[in-house]
Amino acid sequence: MKAQKPGLHPRNRHHQRYDLPALCQAHPDLQGYITLNPLGEQTIDFANPQAVKALNKALLAHFYAVKHWDIPDGFLCPPVPGRADYIHHLADLLAGDSGEVPKDATILDIGTGANLIYPLIGAHEYGWRFTGSEINPQAFASAQAIINGNPGLTRQIRLRRQKESQAIFHGVIHKNETYDATLCNPPFHDSAESARAGGERKRRNLGLGAESGLNFGGQQQELWCEGGEVAFISQMIRESQAFARQVKWFTSLVSRGDNLPPLYRLLTEVGAVKVVKKEMAQGQKQSRFIAWSFMDDAKRRRPF
């Protein structure tokens, strides 16, 4: 009997343990990274960044029909099941307005990253159209290479370069442009030192020493910003006021529950008329995203 992962969204494709033979068929290079755990079961070494990248290539090919996917060394290699959960819960949020999951939704992914993970999943699962913003030139080029390598995606995903280091929505959302929702996985740490300490914790959890030399990935824009995620999301909330009539739902992951109170206070200050929190769980990891809107229920139900 296959074990289920507790807490994943019902529509998430990753409830069962990884079917490694099927994944190897989708991406044969994965075979070279398969080992046996102490129980004699097949697994991969999750401390090996190349093994994790090969697993992601296999998952994206097998479940989401992504034939070309790669990221440069040193960039975040995202856990696919957790990223899929955000997309499915966002679909439920949109369905709450229209009565069903919209098939033609337009979504803005803030900081789409070198991996382009949210647009890849959302385009496949729901047929949504995505705009991905990105400030890092290398990440932008990587995301564009993924789109170009999967011709069917060119009609569903476009990229937009954020040229202003202090801006989030400004310069990305154009005049007269509308979105059903925005999503974002904000930088969590408030300094490079905090980000390094997080990497050390991962090493300890995997039973590795600092001398292991493993790179858990992540560029500065992916991992930290001045003031951490509260500062980043607070800026997002303030900027969102300028686009109150162009976006139905603004959303962002919030990694720590104790970061919510100051964000709720700010949402009240800026006049958000509806605020929703969606709790998520992937195995032992608890996460959540908050969503806010400046439109009442009747306005959100109407198409742009």
From Swiss-Prot:
It comes from the Bacteria. Specifically methylates the adenine in position 1618 of 23S rRNA. It is an enzyme of class 2 (transferase). Signal peptide: none annotated. It is found in: Cytoplasm. One of its GO terms (molecular function) is 23S rRNA (adenine(1618)-N(6))-methyltransferase activity. Keywords: Cytoplasm, Methyltransferase, rRNA processing, S-adenosyl-L-methionine, Transferase. GO terms for cellular component: cytoplasm. It catalyses: adenosine(1618) in 23S rRNA + S-adenosyl-L-methionine = N(6)-methyladenosine(1618) in 23S rRNA + S-adenosyl-L-homocysteine + H(+). The keyword Chaperone does not apply. Belongs to the methyltransferase superfamily. METTL16/RlmF family. Its main location: cytoplasm. HAMAP family: 23SrRNA_methyltr_F. CDD domains: AdoMet_MTases. GO terms for biological process: rRNA base methylation. This is Ribosomal RNA large subunit methyltransferase F. Its EC number is 2.1.1.181. The keyword rRNA processing applies.
